[in-house]
Curated annotation (Swiss-Prot):
Pfam families: Toxin_34. Disulfide bonds: none annotated. This is U14-ctenitoxin-Co1b. GO terms for cellular component: extracellular region. It is found in: Secreted. GO terms for molecular function: toxin activity. It comes from Ctenus ornatus (Brazilian spider). Belongs to the neurotoxin 04 (omega-agtx) family. 03 (type II/III omega-agtx) subfamily. Keywords: Secreted. Not toxic to mice by intracerebroventricular injection. The keyword Secreted applies. Expressed by the venom gland. Its main location: secreted. It comes from the Eukaryota.
Length: 36
């Protein structure tokens, strides 16, 4: 899957949110992150 750019917000895409979780740099509601 693709990874979101730094500071971008995840819209719920599984791949993007997994990347967000793994790298901990972008917002993703389903993992409890809400970073701007």
């Amino acid at each position: 899957g693709s990874c979101l750019e730094l500071g971008k917000y995840c819209d719920g895409s599984k791949d993007d949110c997994q990347c967000c979780r793994d790298n901990a740099y972008c917002g993703c509601d389903i993992f409890g992150y809400n970073w701007e």
